[in-house]
């Protein structure tokens, strides 16, 4: 793959093979921004897990202490009182059968979809549309719930979803390059502590094999996992 001059210049700022202390890695990440806009900061944890094993296929959600800096559009499938609560919580779109019908016609002007358990039998019929886009509500991520007000509030305040991919990696957005260093550090630590809390009992050897941090379109900087705890 041909890299841009900016990418190559940034890659000279650090050693791609070295594992940096967390604080230094974050400082380098903020300095390595290629784009002119406020770039997204992402981290990736490479775990010594087999996603084919049910008990090792990690998936969940958590609220980052400083959010992600990203504004998400929320759609909520609910009726009656729950629909009213969702509107009061400032969900962008709220509906029941009408909203399900709209989605069935390839309307996807939202980033996260929340549903009450009551509406899931109808919504699940759209699995082929929502599944591949990662939009199908799931109890594990708190997007199937009777407490829609809390769900909307948490997502608006920086809740992220994480899932182990087929290569054993968990990718997550932890902020923007405009964030102060301590905010990026605390967000990354929050995800790290969550992954340690849910470590499968069947996990063997070195649980966290690699951790990298990067901005949009920039090379990844390796972090020494020992410096995160």
UniProtKB/Swiss-Prot annotation:
GO terms, biological process: regulation of translation; translation
Keywords of the record: Repressor, Ribonucleoprotein, Ribosomal protein, RNA-binding, rRNA-binding, Translation regulation, tRNA-binding
GO CC terms in record: large ribosomal subunit
Pfam families membership: Ribosomal_L1
rRNA-binding in keyword set: yes
Keyword Oxidoreductase: no
InterPro entries in the cross-refs: Ribosom_uL1_bac-type, Ribosomal_uL1, Ribosomal_uL1-like, Ribosomal_uL1/biogenesis, Ribosomal_uL1_3-a/b-sand, Ribosomal_uL1_CS
SUPFAM superfamilies: Ribosomal protein L1
GO molecular function: rRNA binding; structural constituent of ribosome; tRNA binding
Record function comment: Binds directly to 23S rRNA. The L1 stalk is quite mobile in the ribosome, and is involved in E site tRNA release.
Subunit structure, as described in the record: Part of the 50S ribosomal subunit.
NCBIfam families for the chain: rplA_bact
Family recorded in the similarity comment: Belongs to the universal ribosomal protein uL1 family.
The name this protein goes by in its record: Large ribosomal subunit protein uL1
Designated gene of the protein: rplA
């Amino acid at each position: 793959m041909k890299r841009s001059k900016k990418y190559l210049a940034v890659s000279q700022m650090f050693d791609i093979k070295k594992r940096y202390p967390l604080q230094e890695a974050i400082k380098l990440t903020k300095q390595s921004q290629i784009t002119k806009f406020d770039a997204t900061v992402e981290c990736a944890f490479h775990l010594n897990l087999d996603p084919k094993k049910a008990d090792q296929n990690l998936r969940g959600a958590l609220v980052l202490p400083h959010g992600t800096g990203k504004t998400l559009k929320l759609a909520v499938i609910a009726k009656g009182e729950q629909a009213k609560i969702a509107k009061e919580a400032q969900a962008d779109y709220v509906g029941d059968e009408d909203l399900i019908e709209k989605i069935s016609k390839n309307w996807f002007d939202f980033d996260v979809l929340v549903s009450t358990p009551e509406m899931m039998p109808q919504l699940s019929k759209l699995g082929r549309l929502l599944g591949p886009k990662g939009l199908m509500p799931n109890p594990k991520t708190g997007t199937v719930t009777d407490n829609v007000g809390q769900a909307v509030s948490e997502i608006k305040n920086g809740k992220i979803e994480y899932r182990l991919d087929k290569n054993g990696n968990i990718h997550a957005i932890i902020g923007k390059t405009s964030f102060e260093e301590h905010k990026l550090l605390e967000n990354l630590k929050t995800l790290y502590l969550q992954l340690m809390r849910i470590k499968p009992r069947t996990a063997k050897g070195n649980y966290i094999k690699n951790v990298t941090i990067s901005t949009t379109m920039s090379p990844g900087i390796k972090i020494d996992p020992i410096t995160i705890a």
